[in-house]
Amino acid sequence: MVPSVAKAKDIMRDIASSITANGLPPAITPMVFGFTGAGNVSGGAREIFELLPHEYVPSSALASIASSPPSRWSNKLVGCLLQPQDMVLSPSGSSAFTNAEYTSPLPLPALSCPPIYNILRSYFANPTSYTPVFHRNVLPHLSVLVNGM
């Protein structure tokens, strides 16, 4: 057990130096981290992850990264910030989420909030209207799933 966040960060910096100097073993390269959520849990996990050599990529790049030569990713980790459209297709079958598509049928108060909350409201009100795609499009390409939801 690590006694403090400061000590954990020191350990991660040591690991970062080793990855930079020696690379990752080819058997585990590329090492791809997928982060869900946009709150404090996900933010804290990303804060620690970002102490390591890394590159963030969009989810649309995951399949090509998985098939790329291991040497391309030997000295850094890959991070992907997962969005609602990476989890499910919208009711229209589109992976592009729009505000107009996600008005809640529930009598909820009008809030001034980011569009993601409108999407979540609609999803929780009508989950069967959405088609799951995460298990097919994203999960097979991840080494580590960090659940920040």
Predicted regions and their residues:
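Dinucleotide-binding/catalytic capping subdomain of oxidoreductase cores
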Residues: V2-V32, G43-V144, G148
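Conserved N-terminal Rossmann-fold NAD(P)-binding element of oxidoreductases
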Residues: F33-G37
